[in-house]
Amino acid sequence: MKTNIIRLVMLVFTAFTMLTVTAKPKDRVVVAYVCSWTDLRLPAPTLMTHINYAFGHVNKTFNGVDIQNPPFLEKVVALKKKNPALKINLSIGGWTSGNFSEMAATQANRTAFARDCRRIVDKYGLDGIDIDWEYPTSNEAGISASPDDTKNFTLLMRDLRKALGNKKLLTIATIQDALYIDFRACVKYLDFVNIMGYDQSNPPMHHTTIHRSPLSGHISLEEGIDAHIKNGVPPEKLTLGMPLYGRGDHSNKILDKFMKTGFTDGRYVERWDSIGEVPYLVDKTGKLVWGFDNPRSWAAKCQYIIDRGLLGGMYWETTEDNAQRDGQMTIYESLLKNNKGTIPLKHVLVLTSGKSSVEASQVVDELKQLGMKRHFDVTVLADDAAYTPEYFDRFHLIYQLNADLSKLGNEARKEFETYVDASHGAFFAAKDTAVKGWDWYNTFSQDLRVCPLNQKYWSNTAKMGRNLFCVGNNAKAEEVVELLNL
C-alpha cells in the first residue's frame, strides 16, 4: 500500500512538473530578427509574436545607444497597426559590435546606457530591449574584453531592468554552449533567452543539427538546450534560434542562391541526415558543401521545441527566407497555429485563357490530384484577372497553360518580371509563343532552353540568378512537378 501511494505521488508530481515547465500554445513566442540593412522588404507581421530590430550599438562614449537606420525602425514599429499584439524590441549588439566591455565596467556608464535604452523605447514606442553581446570576456569578434565582463553583464541586466521597469521586455541572445554568462545570477532580470542555434561549424560539418550526428559541428541544438538548462535557465524562458539561410561557400553563386531557388545546376545532390534531422548538399565526391534547413527540418525543430517545453522559437533573419516565406510559414504554422511540427503546402498558379477546353481541364485536374499526393495546392486564374502587388510571390511554380499573356496589365507584368529576374519561383510555359507588346517576355523566352525533362536545366542567364524555366515543351503536369521537385 505504501509503495502504491509513493508511486501515485510521484506520478502526480511528474504530471505537475510537465504542466509547469511546458509553454502553453497561447503563450508561445516566435521571435524574428529584422535587420536595418534589409529595408527594401518589410516582414509579414502576422507570422511572429516578436520582432527584434537589429541593430543598435553601444556608442563611442560608452553611455548610450546608436541606432542603425532609424527611419526603417519606425516603419517596423508601424507594423503594429496590422498586428496590435506584435512586440518589437531593439536588439543591441551583433557580431563585431563592440564597446560593451567599457560600458558595463562602471556604474555610471551602465546607468547612463540603461537610461538611454529607456529613452529609445519610449521615443519609438518599443516593447523592450534585446542584448546581443558576442561575447562577454571574449575578443573573438575583434572587440575589447575583460575578465570582469561576466560579472558586469549581470550588473548590466540589473540596471537595464531597473530602467525599463517590469512592464517592458528584456531579452538576450546567447551562444549555444551557454558560456560567458552567469545565468543563475541574471536570469531573474530576463523575460527570456534566445539561443542562437546556428553557425556552429562550416562544411564539411553541418552548423545546425537537432541531435548529435556524424555531421554535427561543435554542438547540437539538443546539447545547447541542455547546457542552458543545466546553467540555470528554465525551459519556459528559452527560445531556440533557427537559421533561414544555408552555410557554405557563398562565393559559389549556385550554392548562395539555393535557399531562394531550391535548385542547383546538377553538380550537387540533396541528402537528409536522419539523426541530426537536417538536409544538406553534397558534391560529386559525397562531401557536404552546404548545410541548411528546409520545411521538413524547420518542422522537426519546432516539434522539438514543443517536446522540450520551451517558450518558443527564434529565427535569423526574415529576408534570408525565399519569396514564399517557407521558413517563416513553417515556424508560424508549427508553433503558433497547429501546436505541432507542420510542413506547409506549396502553391502552384495555373494561368489559363478562361475558356473551357478538354486539354486545359485535364491538366488542371492532374495537377490537383498530384497536389493531394505531393502536398501542394493549385490556384487557377484567367489571363484577365486582377493582380495585387507581390501576388506572384505566393507561388512556388507558375504554370502558363494557355493564357493570353498580352492581356496582363502593366502592373502584373512588372510583378511577373520581378518574379523571374529575382528568382522568386519557377516558371513553365506549355507552349512557346510570343506576347505582342511585351518585349521583356519575348526576349526572356528566346533565351530559354527547351527542357527535355530528363534533367534539371537552367536558362542561359543562370549567371544572373534566374531560376529554372522551361518553354515550349508539351510535357505532362506530372513531369513538370517531378522536374521542379514539388
Identify the residue ranges that each predicted region occupies.
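Substrate-binding surface in catalytic domains of secreted glycosidases
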Residues: 31, 59-71, 115, 136-267
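Bacterial Sec-dependent N-terminal signal peptides
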Residues: 1-25
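A short, well-structured beta->alpha microelement
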Residues: 36-40, 368-391
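Conserved, mostly hydrophobic/aromatic
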Residues: 51, 90, 131, 160, ...
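Glycan-binding loop/region signatures in secreted carbohydrate-active enzymes
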Residues: 92, 237-304, 330-339
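Glycan-recognition patch characteristic of GH18 chitinases/ENGases
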Residues: 24-121, 333
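A glycine-rich, often tryptophan-bearing local segment used as a flexible ligand/cofactor-contacting loop or short
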Residues: 359-364, 368, 400, 405-485
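Short, charged N-terminal beta->alpha structural module
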Residues: 24-26, 345-375
